[in-house]
């Protein structure tokens, strides 16, 4: 057998992985264990934020029933997601690969309703609460509180993530800042 180096092969003898000509940029080939495979992105991510402003914070009336928070999210870094404002603030996953995603939401909130109130925040996927991604914070009148939520879900194309809130009594919730991070890895 001849000793041939890849660097000396001419074009007709070069072999590209199956389907490379139609694979999207950044894709990796994942073998399915049956002699075939597919091109997929190894990961997707997004960071959505509400700029810090404690002098004129975002505000929203909330009640004793969960409703979606509706701040205006800007995107910091993004691969595979879209920030939407209708029907309310949400982040939608746009890619065809299934992902296992870790979610992290951090915010500074307060209210001026007088007295202490219990404020609950939860992460939702497609309008349903994510198990374990639900916290409660007792907030005092005009005191800023930092709240963090974490969760993990499987994301499919067009799934969306939202943040919902409710309180022990109706109040106006003010948000000085917020950051939502979604980091997804390919699920074979």
Q: Model-found features: residue ranges?
A:
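Extracellular repetitive beta-rich solenoid segments
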Residues: 2-45, 113-117, 126, 142-148, ...
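Solvent-exposed serine/threonine-rich low-complexity stretches and specific carbohydrate-binding patches
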Residues: 131-140
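Surface-exposed loop/turn positions
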Residues: 27, 97, 157-159
């Amino acid at each position: 057998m001849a000793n041939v180096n890849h660097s000396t092969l001419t074009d007709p003898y070069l072999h590209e992985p199956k389907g490379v000509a139609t694979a999207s940029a950044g894709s990796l080939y994942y073998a399915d264990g049956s002699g075939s495979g597919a091109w997929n992105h190894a990961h997707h991510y997004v960071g959505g934020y509400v700029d810090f402003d404690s002098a004129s914070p975002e505000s929203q009336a909330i009640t004793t029933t969960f409703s979606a928070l509706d701040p205006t999210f800007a995107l910091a870094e993004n691969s595979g997601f879209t920030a939407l404002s209708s029907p309310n603030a949400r982040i939608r996953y746009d890619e065809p690969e299934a992902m296992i995603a870790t979610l992290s939401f951090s915010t500074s909130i307060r209210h001026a309703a007088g007295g202490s109130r219990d404020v609950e925040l939860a992460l939702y996927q497609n309008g349903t609460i994510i198990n374990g991604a639900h916290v409660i914070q007792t907030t005092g009148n005009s005191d800023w509180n930092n709240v963090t939520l974490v969760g993990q879900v499987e994301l499919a194309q067009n799934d969306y993530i939202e943040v919902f809130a409710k309180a022990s009594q109706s109040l106006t919730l003010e948000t000085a800042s917020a950051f939502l991070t979604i980091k997804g890895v390919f699920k074979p």
